[in-house]
Each structure stands twice: as structure tokens, then as C-alpha cells.
């Protein structure tokens, strides 16, 4: 492979410090979303051959629908999607939802029913395709466009369906006794709980209703008492032997017991065990070997046992005793007196087997199935009298009806695993055997056998992704629709109807709209930068419908669990009330078809690690020994150490190397994408790493992105998968490039009917959801050869295809005059002057002209009482120009609204009749810039309702758009022509012609020169002798014409869309959107951070000359507080500083060598230095083989600082950092001598100086600072509103009142509480006084006092205010405050 092609300076080359080879390919980072939704819609699948899942399964589960009489039936045949009306960009611009119309083919069958026999025969069948609303489509980046905004559907973690065994941890009962419980959770349907109470009776609950004895549930399943006992207990037969009894010897029940009396062999009569002796397993084995079959027992040994069967007189049928009765003197007497000499006894010994089910049976008041069914009916439907039919139907519908109850495939699989069953996963209802198995398992748990489940284990929690959430929602919509269809089928003349007439698709469409618009899991996409987009799509939430709530979630659910390893990131989760409930998927994790998260492992065969990769879920992994990715290995793949650190069943342990089955794929498979972007993560404290990964998501895209010197190797992956950087869809040659688009002539995947041209439109200064700027810049030049996947253009926060969230800054760790107290950050003025941390933010303003009752509003330049100066930025249509600089209060769009008519005098009426309308009946409602915003207009869009005349501005925008479309069409046409005519001339060359254009001599041999004499359009007239070539010519012609017409058609469609009116909300005639771009330089009060959770606020920006400087005169850019490191324990930032310093040092050397090369033309020293930096290793070989051009390109890339990658948990260690420093010719302490910029004196001690990657976070002081003089007031309390968004005031709270009281500032305080807040009359008076230039005013009663009085009155307390003047005598009687 020629390295010259692969490197053309378009991607960043990094020195790689990782030592562990990457075996598995990292899955696409947004696969979770895309795969799930594709599986739901199955757009690509052929109509007939769709499997029963997703949308197909939903339709199959609701249809067929029969009417109440059974005379007609509506069947589902298939569904298909029509192409969406608007593409993604059009939907964004017009505030529409990106969706495709769903057409469902339904079949209506009408039956003839014979009145006498009831036999059905088909009378009529009608099929029709019915429109069922629009189904939102996912964009290529895994998002949805809903009403013009990008949204993400977050995956939900919930408890997997199946059966769970648990106990109450001793909390329910004062004795601290463990009460065990089992719960069967279906995917949908009633929950079944089976639980013990404090008296060891087993109860069942359905849907958490009143509890009933579990034996009633078993009777309702058709069992009687004897059968129940037979199912749960073994039987022993006690036989009468002379005066005593012969009891069978069962060693397994006697283990560990003590012989109270001596044990006698019933056959030989000898004593086999002395009294008081312990029965050890060895002793019992010896007795069995000796052939001991039965023991001798007296009557008193039988007491306390229970009968296993009814004792019945078979001749009369009289029942003496029932199964389960306890044997005592009385019952034994009855048995013996009736001549029974054999007693069947239950195998209950109260040690290994408890009498719980027997006790429950005896406590149960229900005797038979009918009583049990009635009891269950009364619990489920209290107040309704039960009949046998209704009770039976209700009980069956609870667990045994596939319509109402669905365990789902997952539930069945989990149930099989837990209960050791082997049932097909298509059996989605409960069976009698399932319930019995659950009760058996629960009783065994109570007897001390088996383990309870851990509900936080990822084997018991599963992920519901978009597709599944959508499926459930759509099912709800269809079920609502089903009721309406049934009613309509019964009430309508069925013979004359088509399926279309029965269907009202509104409920289904509404369910979809409701889900995307207002579900808790449908979220406004976090679009600050590419990383925040990707993280949002990979998020797992335990909240949402059917999930947990913040308040009820305890510590256990939020905690990190051993099964999270390689599946869920232990670091990245929000701080605050949602901690641990919202998680992020680990880098290599994927979700399997059952919704469980899987992680990849390498197989170990015969003690050697292979490159065979296996994905396992938490349940499957438990039985293996898994070695860590960094375990030391020999070249042949065997382990170096005898004992290897590994994970097994949730524990980390040392185990012999022979017992290893699997090995981790990569050290970064533990963490999420954001955490994997932090270099030296292994040296940071986890709390700070959490902050670091969360803050990277808030980094604002800067004006000039710059990739970090010290990266981790994850950067290109994020840039590519997020869709921020544009990758080539297929290989080809770059044909045209400008700032807005790239045209590539494809050289691969050239199928017939597929365009041979790829046009990539770049987004220019678009607004993101968070008002940051999305802008893409081309990296390629005309004539470049590109391969599939090559990066063609950088997006926001990307640099040469690498994620670039911030900038490399020269940092010194030292105190500086107290300006870095409490994590504050001191910056140099150079950073402001060079726009290092400058970002662009785009705000959108929209104005609508509505049709009001008094007449239509109008967008116009003609505004009453506004000076010409204020209109200077508006065009003749009243809309601001693109490129205008605007400030607070400037008019963006002029708009007038009709005012209410005032009654006119006859004179006015006369004047109006003579001179026409007058201008004073409108008021100015123009849109103006809000306070505190300055910027430049970058885009204006005008939307008109159908049939409303377009203004000049709208026409101009439309013309521009059509020109742009025409240019696209012409370019594509030109490339098509060039390709086709090129192929045509190749075919004709050397052929003998038999026909040609007018005036052409037949029989001539064709050559380039001959053909070129004629215009291109006439080339098709040539015909040749060779029939094979002639047929190829005709095929080419057909293909060309088809491509041409397809292109023209596409162009016409788009033009038609541009020209036709827009769909508007009701009552809106016209809408204008104005986009204002604001350039924000960094300033004091802005928040900045590094990647290690080291955040701070800019405290001061100092002139460059005052900043500390190095010996070569370089001033540092940033001064950080050294005290921010030790207590926070994020040492990673120090290692990053040193390594960054070494990178810059190497870059300086390379820069000097480039200059030397320019002077003497010798490239070898440069090649050698680059080779030394890269070193050896798997990723280094290609760099050593670069040609001279590539070396120069790479040197140019590296001259500011060498790019390196230090992957998490496998990166550079202290030795590597020292080596790099030495290579760069720097001291290996990493410290430098600094001089004070103000005095020029040297600082006493050496200072750590180096490069740190700093981010500017989306917490800008401009968005927060805010002032109000007058503004809106709250309706009830009349106090000013709060917050910047409401233009509110500052709250003067309780503590501030204390401060003024402490100063004794009584008048100031009174003002604060009255006229400056909610004394309505007082504040107007103050205003009037100030206007008069007078400063006397009086404070009245605050409105909040009136509210208080009203509230007390509403409680029935008569509070009256007495308004009396006190005379002097009364005043003197008042208690003196001073006393």
C-alpha cells in the first residue's frame, strides 16, 4: 500500500504510547440508536418477508379485528412507507417533523352466517391501502427532527421481565426475621407476588392487591389439597410392627442431627446408634452400606408428623382424617381403631423441609376450586357478585391470555434460567408449572437452599432502546383505535364499506406525536459540541415511564455494580439528584436482541489468548474467569505469570493461569467515550474524573479549533461517529470545492441508476440547539484522490478530523497576587487579542404576522412614530439586511398591529369618508433586539402562507435558493456528461461507422479527431458495424437519458417545494426568522476547565507584559493555583502539563529543522528527528515509510507541538514522560525558571510550566449578568419576577433583611420591603415624585400583606384592620421599645 496516498495532511498523526494491541474494532458509537430504530421500522425489508418484530409485530398483535357479532373481520396484510415529503434540512428550516407517511394494506372479510347452523361462509373480500399517519424517521446521526428541533430518544434501563426472589432484609418484622418473597414480572400484564408472612404462611398477591393464601391460587389452577401436598412433599410409609412402627431409614434427611434416643434396626433389633451421638455423613454412609433399611419407632415418635393422604373407609366412603392433619394421640387412636396398619406420612422434619405449604393449606378457608376462584374475583373486583363463569374468565385473563399477558421472549428466557425449565421462548404466558416452580423455589429458599437475586445485577436489568419504546407507544395507539373500529364495524352497513371508512388513524398518530413531543425520554438534544451529542445518544436512564423516580431510588440502584464492568461507565454520571440513575454506555458495549448489555472478550484456548472476540452479557459472563487486558503475555499468547489477576462471579482475585477462559479486549472498554478522552485518567481521583468527563460536554466550539497535543487516540473516532466531520461515502476524485459544498466524482460503487457524483453540502454558521455555532470547513483541494471514510471537511470542534474541544495553553502553576484564590484563573491579554478562546453564538428571533379580529398585522417598513435613523438597517419590506451590526433596542423586523376602534365624531367620519384611512389606528409591535445582545445578522428566512402575496425580500431569498439548486444540477450534469461522453468516445474509437450526423461519410473508421468535429449532442447519431458495441452504445444512451431526466425531475421537485407556500400555524399569515451571530471573547466571569475536573472562573485578564515569562522571553498564557492539585488528587493534569511541555519542545526543534531544510534542502535530519519522536511500535511503521512530501506535511503539522496519544489505563508512564522531556532537550523535572513580568526579577523557586488543554465552558458571564430597573410583576403578590429570562429583579431575602437590621438602616429597609417591591400605589408615587424632581414619598401597605390577610380570611379568621388615630395619652401608654 503506497503511503503517499494515505497521508495528505488531512488527518492528524499522533505518536502512540499504548502497548496493548487493539484486537476488536470499536462498534460505531451511535449504533445503539440506529440499529434499534431500523429493527422497529424495517424499511429495507421486503413487504412480504418481514419477521414478527417491531412494527410488524404491533400490527399482528392488534389485527385481525372482528366485530361483536363475528360477521366481519379486518385483517392486516402489510405496511409500507412512502418517501418523506421534506428532507432533513427543509424540516429544520420550516419547523416540521421529519417523517414518512405510513400506508397499511388491510383486508376486510365479510361473512355469511347461516341462521340455523351458525356456519360461516365468506361473502366478500376487499383489500385497500390505508394512510395511518406519519412515522418519524431517524436522521443519519441517530436523532429525530420534531417540529424543526433535533431530539434524542434516550434508552431506558428497567427491570427485566422474569421471576425474582428476594427478602425484606429483616425490616418488616420486629424480630428481624427474613421474610422471603418471589415476584413474577411480565413485560405487560398483572404482577404476581408470592410471599411469606411472619408466621411462615405463604400468601399470593395479584397486582399488589389484598393477599390470599397461595393454596387458594393453586386450587384455582385446578389442584386439590392432597395434590398440593403431593407436589411439595415426599411421602414415607410408616408400617405397624408389633407394638411399634417400622419407619424407612433416609440418611439424606438426618445429616448433622443428633440421636435423642437410641436408634434400633427394625429388622435385626440391634442398636445401631447410641443416644446422644451425632449423625455425621460418614456414620450415615456406613449405616447405608451395612444395609440398614428401616428403624424401629414407638407411638410417640409418630406424634407431630402429618398425614400425606386422606384416611378413608373405602366401603362407606367415610373420611376419618384428611391429608395434612397432624398425628397426635387422638388421631392415632382413630387410625388404629379402624384397623389401618400403614400410615402415609409427609416428609416434613422442620429442619430440612418446613411445613409451610401444609400450614398454609390448613389456614386456608377455601375448600375447593370454586371458593378459590370467587375469592380471587372478590380481591380483583371488589363489590361485584361473582359467578362461576365470570370468575373463571377473569382468572384466565390474568395470566393465561396472550392478549392481556405477555412475558416477552426475555421474560421466558430469564424464567427458564432461574427455574431450570426448558420452555420455548414463544410461550409468552404463564403456565401452571411455572407458578408451581416459583412456589417450590421460594419454599426451598425459606428452607435455606439457594440464593436470592441481586436486582442491581445487569443480568436482571435490561435496556429499552428507541425501537422498543416506540413499539409500546404505537401499540397503545392501535389499541385505542381498535375499540373505535369495533364499534364502527357493528354500527355501519358492512357490505358497502371499504377498510378506509372503518379506520380513523388519529389515535395512532396522536400516540406517536405524544411520545416524541412530551415523553420524559424524548429529550431536546444536547448539541453544545460533537461529544455532548454522542454522549446524549449513548445515555441510559433509569427514570421515565415504567422506571424509577428520583425520590424513591435508594443507594443500591445508583451504586456501581461489578457487572457494570465493560458495560456501563463507572465514572460518567451527573452530579446531583440524578447521580447513578443516568449512566453512559461503555466504549465497546453493545445491546443484544434481548436488551441486555454485552461486552467483548478474547477467547483463551489451551492457555493461549486468541484474537477471536466474543460478546457476552452479564449473566453469561458470571461463569468465566476473565483476565485483565493488561495481563503480561509471552509472544505466543500465553501468560507470563503463574497466577493472573482476574474477575470471576463479581470478585477480583488471583487465579492460576490455566483456569482463565477469557480476557478483556482493551483497557478502555471499562469507561465511556467522554472518560476515554481524558489522558492520564488512571492518575485522577474518580470524583474529579467524573467532573472532567461531564465538563468536556459543556465545552463551547471555539473560533479556531485546535486538537490537543496530549490526546488519547479516541479523538478521531468521536469526530467521525458524531457526524461533525464529514467522511467520504465512497472513493473518488475531488472535482469542485468551495466553502459551502464539495463535489466528488465517484470511482467506486458505480452501479447503474446510482449517480456517479457525490455532492456534500457543508453547514455554514447554523445555530445548534444550545445556540452554539455549527460551521463546516473543507479540508480537500481539487484533484485530491479520496478513499471511503476519509475526512473531507472539519465541523465544529474538530481539527483535521480530530475532536478539538479547546486550545493548548501555556500554563504556570504558581500563586499570582491572590488572583488565583479559590480556583480562579488568571489569563494573559494575548489570549483575548489573538481570539484564542473566542466563540461564535447564534441566536434566533422569530416574528409572526397574524390575522387578528381587528384586521391583519403587517410586516412593513412604514412604522408610526419611528425615526428614519431607527429604520436604517431595514429593507423596503421592513426586514433587517444580512450583515447589519445590531445592538439592544434595534428593530429587526418592522410590524404594525391594528388598534381597537375608538368611537368617531361625525366630523371625523366625514373627513375619513373624504380622505380615506388614517394612519393612527395601528400600533408599533416591531421585534427589537433584547437588552444585552449585540451581534451581526447572518441569515434571514421569510415564510408565507399559501396564497399570501410574497414581498420583495421573500422573492429574493427564493431566487437565491433556486440558483443554488440550479448550480448543483448543472455541476452534476457536467460531471455526468464528461463521464458518459468520455465512455462514448472510447467505445467509438477504432470502430467502422455505418451511420452518422448529416454530411458524414459512411464506412469511415472513427477516431477522436473525426468525432470531435461534431458537437457532442450529435455523437449519438454515429452507428457502428460491430453489433455488440452498437448494443452497448444504445444501453449507454438509455442510461444517460434516464440519469438526465431523473436529475431534471429532482430539480423541478425541489424548485416546486421552494416556490409553494409554507404550512403555518392557524391564524399566521407570515413568519420571519432572523439569526444574529454574536462573537464572545473570553472575559472575567467566564468559566474554564481542563480535562481533569480542574474548573475555575476567569478572575482577571492581565496585560501580556505583566505576566510571568520564561528565560527565552515567552510569556505564559494562564496562571493556575498549585493548591488546586493536592487536595483534589487529579494528578493527571500535572502529567499532562509535563508531556505537553515536551511536545512543544519537540515542535520547536522540528520548526528549526524545517527552516534548515528550506535553507539547505537536506531533509534527512528532519526525517530522523520525526523518526526518533515516533519511535517503534505498530502505529509508527507507516510514518517511517513516508515520502518527502508527507514528511514535510507532517513536520508542518507538528511544528507548534507534537501530537501524541496516551490511551487510558495503557498510556505513558513517568519514565515515558521523562524520556520525552530529554528528547526535547528539556530538564526532566519539568520545571523552569520564571521571571516576574512586572519587576523583571526572577522568582525564588522553579515553577512547573507546560501545556494544558483548556476548555471554555458554556457558562458565559454574558448569559448570566443582568440588570433591571422596571419590569414585569407577579400577578398575585405584585412582587417583581425573578430570573434573567423573565427580566426579573434581585431577591432581597431574609438574610439581607438581617443585614440591614444590623446596620439599623430602617428607612432603607422600609423602602426595600414596600416601594421597591410590592407596594403598588407607593411605587407609582415614587415614580411621579422622581419625575417631578422631588424626593419625598410615603410607603404604604405591601401587597403581600393583603395576600396574607386574604389567606387568613379564607381559613375563616376574621382579620380586620382598624384605622384609628391615637391621641397623646394613648400613645404614652404604649410600651416603650427601648425598655
From Swiss-Prot:
EC number: 2.7.7.6
A biological process term (GO) from this entry: DNA-templated transcription
Keyword set includes Cell membrane: no
Transmembrane feature ranges: none
Keywords noted in UniProt: DNA-directed RNA polymerase, Nucleotidyltransferase, Transcription, Transferase
Cellular-component GO terms for this entry: DNA-directed RNA polymerase complex
One Gene Ontology MF term: DNA binding
Top-level EC class: transferase
Protein family according to the UniProt entry: Belongs to the RNA polymerase beta chain family.
Protein name, as recorded: DNA-directed RNA polymerase subunit beta
Amino acid at each position: 500500500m503506497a503511503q503517499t496516498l494515505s497521508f495528505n495532511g488531512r488527518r492528524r498523526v499522533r505518536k502512540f504510547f499504548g502497548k496493548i494491541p487493539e484486537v476488536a474494532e470499536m462498534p460505531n458509537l451511535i449504533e445503539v440508536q440506529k440499529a434499534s430504530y431500523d429493527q422497529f421500522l424495517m424499511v429495507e425489508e421486503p413487504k412480504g418477508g418481514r419477521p414478527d418484530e417491531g412494527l410488524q409485530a404491533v400490527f399482528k398483535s392488534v389485527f385481525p379485528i372482528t366485530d361483536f357479532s363475528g360477521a366481519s373481520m379486518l385483517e392486516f396484510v402489510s405496511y409500507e412507507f412512502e418517501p418523506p415529503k421534506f428532507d432533513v434540512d427543509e424540516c429544520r428550516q420550516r419547523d416540521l417533523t421529519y417523517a414518512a407517511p405510513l400506508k397499511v394494506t388491510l383486508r376486510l372479510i365479510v361473512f355469511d352466517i347461516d341462521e340455523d347452523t351458525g356456519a360461516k361462509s365468506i361473502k366478500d373480500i376487499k383489500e385497500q391501502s390505508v394512510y395511518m399517519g406519519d412515522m418519524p424517521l431517524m436522521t443519519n446521526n441517530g436523532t429525530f427532527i420534531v417540529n424543526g428541533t433535533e431530539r434524542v430518544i434516550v434508552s431506558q434501563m428497567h427491570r427485566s421481565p422474569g421471576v425474582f426472589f428476594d427478602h425484606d432484609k429483616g425490616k418488616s418484622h420486629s424480630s428481624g426475621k427474613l421474610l422471603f418473597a418471589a415476584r413474577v414480572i411480565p413485560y405487560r400484564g398483572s404482577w404476581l407476588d408470592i410471599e411469606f408472612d411472619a408466621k411462615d404462611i405463604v400468601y399470593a398477591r395479584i397486582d399488589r392487591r389484598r393477599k390470599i393464601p397461595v393454596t387458594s391460587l393453586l386450587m384455582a389452577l385446578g389442584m386439590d389439597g392432597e395434590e398440593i401436598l403431593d407436589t411439595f412433599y415426599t411421602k414415607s410409609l410408616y408400617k405397624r410392627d408389633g407394638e411399634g412402627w417400622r419407619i424407612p431409614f433416609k440418611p439424606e434427611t438426618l445429616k448433622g442431627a443428633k440421636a435423642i434416643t437410641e436408634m434400633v434396626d427394625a429388622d435385626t433389633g440391634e442398636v445401631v446408634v447410641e443416644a446422644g451421638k451425632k449423625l455425621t455423613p460418614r456414620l450415615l454412609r456406613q449405616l447405608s452400606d451395612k444395609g440398614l433399611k428401616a428403624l424401629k419407632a414407638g407411638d410417640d415418635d409418630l406424634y407431630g408428623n402429618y398425614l400425606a393422604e386422606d384416611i378413608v373407609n373405602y366401603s362407606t366412603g367415610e373420611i376419618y382424617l384428611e391429608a395434612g392433619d397432624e398425628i397426635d394421640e387422638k388421631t392415632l387412636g382413630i387410625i388404629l381403631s379402624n384397623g389401618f396398619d400403614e400410615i402415609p406420612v409427609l416428609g416434613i422434619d422442620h429442619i430440612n423441609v418446613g411445613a409451610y405449604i401444609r400450614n398454609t393449606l390448613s389456614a386456608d378457608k377455601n375448600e375447593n376450586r370454586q371458593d378459590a376462584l370467587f375469592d380471587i374475583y372478590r380481591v380483583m373486583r371488589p363489590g361485584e357478585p361473582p359467578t362461576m363463569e365470570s370468575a373463571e374468565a377473569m382468572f384466565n385473563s390474568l395470566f393465561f391470555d396472550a392478549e392481556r399477558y405477555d412475558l416477552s421472549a426475555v421474560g421466558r428466557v430469564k424464567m427458564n434460567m432461574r427455574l431450570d425449565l426448558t420452555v420455548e421462548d414463544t410461550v409468552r404466558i404463564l403456565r401452571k408449572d411455572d407458578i408451581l416452580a416459583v412456589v417450590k423455589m421460594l419454599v426451598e429458599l425459606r428452607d435455606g437452599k439457594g440464593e436470592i437475586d441481586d436486582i442491581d445485577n445487569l443480568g436482571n436489568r435490561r435496556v429499552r432502546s428507541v425501537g422498543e419504546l416506540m413499539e409500546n407507544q404505537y401499540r397503545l395507539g392501535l389499541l385505542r383505535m381498535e375499540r373505535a373500529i369495533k364499534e364502527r364495524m357493528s354500527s355501519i352497513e358492512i357490505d358497502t364499506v371499504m377498510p378506509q371508512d372503518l379506520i380513523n388513524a388519529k389515535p395512532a398518530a396522536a400516540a406517536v406525536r405524544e411520545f416524541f413531543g412530551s415523553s420524559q425520554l424524548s429529550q431536546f438534544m444536547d448539541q453544545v459540541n460533537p461529544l455532548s451529542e454522542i454522549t446524549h445518544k449513548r445515555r441510559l436512564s433509569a427514570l421515565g415511564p415504567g422506571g424509577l423516580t428520583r425520590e424513591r431510588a435508594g443507594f443500591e440502584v445508583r451504586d456501581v455494580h461489578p457487572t457494570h464492568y465493560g458495560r456501563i461507565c463507572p465514572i460518567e454520571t451527573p452530579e446531583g439528584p440524578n447521580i447513578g440513575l443516568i449512566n453512559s454506555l461503555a466504549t465497546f458495549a453493545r445491546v443484544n436482541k434481548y436488551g441486555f448489555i454485552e461486552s467483548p472478550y478474547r477467547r483463551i484456548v489451551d492457555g493461549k489468548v486468541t484474537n477471536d472476540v466474543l460478546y457476552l452479557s452479564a449473566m453469561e459472563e458470571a461463569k468465566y474467569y476473565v483476565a485483565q487486558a493488561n495481563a503480561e503475555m509471552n509472544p505466543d499468547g500465553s501468560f507470563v505469570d503463574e497466577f493472573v489477576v482476574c474477575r470471576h462471579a463479581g470478585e477480583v482475585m488471583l487465579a492460576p493461569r490455566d483456569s482463565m477462559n477469557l480476557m478483556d479486549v482493551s483497557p478502555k472498554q471499562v469507561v465511556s467515550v467522554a472518560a476515554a478522552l481524558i489522558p492520564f485518567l488512571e492518575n485522577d481521583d474518580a470524583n474529579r474524573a467524573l467532573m472532567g468527563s461531564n465538563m468536556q460536554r459543556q465545552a463551547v466550539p471555539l473560533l479556531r479549533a485546535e486538537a490537543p497535543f496530549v490526546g488519547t487516540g479516541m479523538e478521531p473516532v468521536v469526530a467521525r461517529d458524531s457526524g461533525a466531520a464529514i467522511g467520504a461515502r465512497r472513493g473518488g476524485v475531488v472535482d469542485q470545492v468551495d466553502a459551502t459544498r464539495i463535489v466528488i466524482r465517484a470511482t467506486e460503487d458505480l452501479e447503474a441508476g446510482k449517480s456517479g457524483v457525490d455532492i456534500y453540502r457543508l453547514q455554514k454558521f447554523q445555530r445548534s440547539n444550545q445556540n452554539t455555532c455549527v460551521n463546516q470547513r473543507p479540508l480537500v483541494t481539487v484533484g485530491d484522490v479520496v478513499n471511503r471514510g476519509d475526512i473531507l471537511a472539519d465541523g465544529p470542534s474538530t481539527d483535521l478530523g480530530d475532536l478539538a474541544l479547546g486550545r493548548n495553553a501555556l500554563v504556570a502553576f504558581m500563586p499570582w497576587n491572590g488572583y488565583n484564590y479559590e480556583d480562579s484563573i488568571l489569563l494573559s491579554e494575548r489570549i483575548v487579542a489573538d481570539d484564542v478562546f473566542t466563540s461564535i453564538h447564534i441566536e434566533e428571533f422569530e416574528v409572526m404576522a397574524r390575522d387578528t379580529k381587528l384586521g391583519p398585522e403587517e410586516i412593513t417598513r412604514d412604522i408610526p412614530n419611528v425615526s428614519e435613523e431607527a429604520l436604517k438597517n431595514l429593507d423596503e419590506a421592513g426586514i433587517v439586511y444580512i450583515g447589519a451590526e445590531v445592538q439592544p433596542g434595534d428593530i429587526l423586523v418592522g410590524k404594525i398591529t391594528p388598534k381597537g376602534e375608538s368611537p368617531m365624531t361625525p366630523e371625523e367620519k366625514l373627513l375619513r369618508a373624504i380622505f380615506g384611512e388614517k394612519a393612527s389606528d395601528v400600533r408599533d409591535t416591531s421585534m427589537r433586539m433584547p437588552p444585552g445582545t449585540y451581534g451581526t445578522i447572518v441569515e434571514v428566512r421569510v415564510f408565507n402562507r399559501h396564497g399570501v402575496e410574497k414581498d420583495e425580500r421573500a422573492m429574493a431569498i427564493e431566487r437565491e435558493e433556486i440558483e443554488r439548486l440550479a448550480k448543483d444540477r448543472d455541476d452534476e450534469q457536467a460531471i455526468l456528461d464528461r463521464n458518459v461522453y468520455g465512455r462514448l468516445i472510447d467505445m467509438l474509437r477504432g470502430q467502422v461507422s455505418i451511420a452518422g450526423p448529416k454530411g458524414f461519410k459512411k464506412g469511415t473508421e472513427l477516431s477522436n479527431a473525426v468525432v470531435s468535429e461534431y458537437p457532442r449532442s450529435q455523437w449519438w447519431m454515429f452507428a457502428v458495424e460491430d453489433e455488440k458495441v452498437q448494443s452497448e452504445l444504445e444501453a449507454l444512451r438509455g442510461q444517460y437519458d434516464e440519469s438526465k431526466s431523473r436529475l431534471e425531475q429532482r430539480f423541478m421537485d425541489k424548485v416546486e417545494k421552494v416556490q409553494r407556500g409554507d404550512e403555518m400555524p392557524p391564524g399566521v399569515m407570515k413568519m420571519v426568522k432572523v439569526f444574529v451571530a454574536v462573537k464572545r471573547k473570553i472575559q472575567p466571569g467566564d468559566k474554564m476547565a481542563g480535562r481533569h475536573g480542574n474548573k475555575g472562573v476567569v478572575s482577571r485578564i492581565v496585560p501580556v507584559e505583566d505576566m510571568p515569562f520564561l528565560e527565552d522571553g515567552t510569556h505564559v498564557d494562564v496562571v493556575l493555583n498549585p493548591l488546586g492539585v493536592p487536595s483534589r488528587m487529579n494528578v493527571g493534569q500535572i502529567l499532562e502539563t509535563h508531556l505537553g511541555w515536551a511536545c512543544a519542545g519537540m515542535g520547536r526543534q522540528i520548526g528549526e529543522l524545517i527552516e534548515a531544510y528550506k535553507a539547505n534542502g537536506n531533509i534527512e535530519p528532519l526525517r530522523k528527528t520525526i523518526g526518533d519522536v515516533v519511535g517503534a511500535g505498530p502505529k509508527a511503521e507507516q510514518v517511517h515509510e513516508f515520502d518527502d512530501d508527507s514528511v514535510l506535511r507532517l513536520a508542518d503539522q507538528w511544528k507548534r507541538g507534537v501530537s501524541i496519544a496516551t490511551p487510558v489505563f495503557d498510556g505513558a508512564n513517568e519514565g515515558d514522560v521523562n524520556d520525552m522531556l530529554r528528547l526535547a532537550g528539556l530538564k526532566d523535572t519539568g520545571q523552569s525558571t520564571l521571571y516576574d513580568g512586572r519587576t523583571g526579577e526572577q522568582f525564588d523557586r522553579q515553577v512547573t510550566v507546560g501545556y494544558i488543554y483548556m476548555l471554555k465552558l458554556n457558562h458565559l458571564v454574558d448569559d448570566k449578568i443582568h440588570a433591571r430597573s422596571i419590569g414585569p410583576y407577579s400577578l398575585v403578590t405584585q412582587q417583581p419576577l425573578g430570573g434573567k429570562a423573565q427580566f426579573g429583579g434581585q431577591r432581597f431575602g431574609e438574610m439581607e433583611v438581617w443585614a440591614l437590621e444590623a446596620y439599623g438602616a430602617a428607612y432603607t429597609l422600609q423602602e426595600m420591603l414596600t416601594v421597591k417591591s410590592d407596594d403598588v400605589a407607593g411605587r407609582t408615587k415614587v415614580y411621579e415624585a422622581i419625575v417631578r424632581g422631588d424626593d419625598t414619598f410615603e410607603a404604604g401597605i405591601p401587597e403581600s400583606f393583603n395576600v396574607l390577610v386574604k389567606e387568613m380570611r379564607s381559613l375563616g379568621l376574621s382579620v380586620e384592620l382598624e384605622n384609628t388615630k391615637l391621641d397623646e395619652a394613648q400613645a404614652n401608654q404604649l410600651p416603650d421599645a427601648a425598655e
